[in-house]
Amino acid sequence: MGASKAPDAPRVLVIDDDDDLRTLVVRVVKQAGYGVDSAADGQAGLDRLAERTYDVIVCDVRMPGMDGVTFYREVERRDPAAARRVVFMTTHVRSEECRDFLWGVHAPVLNKLFTLDEFRSTLAQIVGPRR
């Protein structure tokens, strides 16, 4: 899924296996003035990253197939600068390993009960506010 925005508009990649949430987040990103693409899992996200550069990557932690942790580690291996632009979404962290991972990468983490203002603020922290 793509969006037509001004060529200089920051680009956001949204990765989440929940179709409804992914669609909602894509809509919010577009309304905030960003260009946006989406993917339903980590592997599809990596495929998108091979095609273009993104200013922000919003990624679910728990997904079937390639989860967010594995996705992040692969992005970090391929392009450490891109890994610093990842924002994670999660309902809650269940395993100690996942908690340790999120704590260790120092990436922003949005609870999936986030408000639209929290989401927009997190994007703006990474790429700056949109006019």
Task: Show which residues each predicted segment covers.
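Hydrophobic/aromatic residues positioned on beta-strands within the core alpha/beta folds
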Residues: M89-T90
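Short hydrophobic/Thr-rich beta-strand motif most characteristic of the beta2 strand and flanking loop
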Residues: G33-A40, R48
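Acidic catalytic/metal-coordinating carboxylates
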Residues: A40-A44, D67-R73
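A Lys-centered signature of the CheY-like receiver
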Residues: K112
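Receiver (REC) domain active-site loop signature in two-component systems and cognate sites
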Residues: M63
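Active-site residues of response regulator receiver
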Residues: D60
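Non-catalytic signal-transmission and effector/linker regions of two-component phosphorelay proteins
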Residues: M1-R11, T115-R131
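Charged docking surfaces used in two-component/phosphorelay signaling
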Residues: T23-Q31
